[in-house]
Amino acid sequence: MIPPQKVFLVDDEPALLRALSRLLRAEGFEVAPFSNATDFLKAHDPDAPGCLVLDVSMPSMTGIELQQHLIEAGSNLAIIFLTGNGDIPMSVRAIKAGAVDFLTKPVKDSELIGAIRLGIKKTHENRSTQNEIASLKNRLKLLTTREQEVFLHVVKGEPNKQIASTLGTNF
């Protein structure tokens, strides 16, 4: 059985948090609502997979500031902005920084759920890619010094004879 996918909601509007929580739970998501970015950061495990649905305009820390904080912390959490007062430069900045989507309130349920599913898919793809990279780095560490020298020439695309000549061995 596949565990429920976690969606973090951060919005300072209590009525919206309740409505979105009900909607997403009905769709089978596990929901963690927060009324501000500070509470979210206190409770959030940076290694936890999932998707963050985030308001732009909030007191103390804006959604854009939270996004930047998560990027600096190395989080892979997919971010979807949901705002009532965004503008084009703000949305471009958010998307360039890695947001999956930038939606405006009111939003169709199907549009939000589709964006969340895409965000969760991207989170899993990023996690899989990071695991693959870590595995490859560990395998590289197993190479001897000489094998590492040869490897560096191979990845540059040098032919075997040139590598042998450069490293002073016979081919």
Regions found by a protein language model. Name each.
Residues 8, 47-53:
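Active-site beta3 strand of CheY-like receiver
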Residues 42, 64-76, 93:
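Short amphipathic alpha-helix used as the core "switch/output" element in two-component signaling
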Residues 55, 83:
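Active-site residues of response regulator receiver
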Residues 58:
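Receiver (REC) domain active-site loop signature in two-component systems and cognate sites
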